[in-house]
Amino acid sequence: MGAAGDAAIGRESRELMSAADVGRTISRIAHQIIEKTALDDPVGPDAPRVVLLGIPTRGVTLANRLAGNITEYSGIHVGHGALDITLYRDDLMIKPPRPLASTSIPAGGIDDALVILVDDVLYSGRSVRSALDALRDVGRPRAVQLAVLVDRGHRELPLRADYVGKNVPTSRSESVHVRLREHDGRDGVVISR
C-alpha cells in the first residue's frame, strides 16, 4: 500500500509479518505445493499438470512469486495467471463499483489440471466462492485447491485453504493488510483496528 494505503491502515496497527517473513512464507508454501502435488516426481502416475491462478490484485502477484519459486526449487515450469472475480461477487450491489481486472489463463487452459487458487487473505470465504464460480466459466479442472498468505478466520462459507502461510486469529473489527513490493514498495503484513 502506498501513502494512501498507509493512511487507511489507521493509527492502531502492528506488524504481523516482516518482508523476510513474507519471503520465507512464500518459499514454504512453494515447497508444500511441490510435495503435495507430486511436482517433485513429474513423471509419476499421480503428477498432475498444475496451474496457479491468482485472485486480483495481490493474489496474482503471490501466484507469480509462487510459480517462480516452484520452478527454481523443482525445475518444473508451472502455468500461472489471473482469475477476475468481479462479476461473480455477491456484494456488487452493496460495495462501490470496482474496475474489472483481466483474466489470463496460461496456454493449455485449465481442463484436467490441478488449479490452485491463490489469494492474499482468507476471511469470509466469499471471494473464494466467487473464484469457484468464475472458474466454472473458464474450464473444467481436475481439482481445485486454495493457497493463501494469511487466514484470519471468520468464515461465512464452508471453505478452507490447502496451503496457509500464517493463521492469524482476529476480531471482526480488525483489518489485515498485505503489502507486496510490486504494489506497495515493500513486503509485509499489518493488522489494524
Curated annotation (Swiss-Prot):
UniProt catalytic activity: UMP + diphosphate = 5-phospho-alpha-D-ribose 1-diphosphate + uracil
Residues the entry annotates as binding substrate: T57, R58, R98, D119, D120, V121, L122, Y123, S124, G125, R126, S127, R152, V176
Motif (PRPP-binding): 115-127
Enzyme class at the top of the EC tree: transferase
GO MF term list: uracil phosphoribosyltransferase activity
Top-rank taxon: Bacteria
An annotated GO cellular component: peptidoglycan-based cell wall
Gene3D superfamilies recorded: 3.40.50.2020
EC number: 2.4.2.9
UniProt xrefs under InterPro entries: PRibTrfase_dom, PRTase-like, PyrR, PyrR_bifunctional
Gene Ontology biological-process entries: regulation of DNA-templated transcription
Keywords per UniProt: Glycosyltransferase, Transcription, Transcription regulation, Transferase
Record's function text: Regulates the transcription of the pyrimidine nucleotide (pyr) operon in response to exogenous pyrimidines.
Protein family (similarity comment): Belongs to the purine/pyrimidine phosphoribosyltransferase family. PyrR subfamily.
Protein name: Bifunctional protein PyrR
Organism: Mycobacterium tuberculosis (strain ATCC 25618 / H37Rv)
Gene name of this polypeptide: pyrR
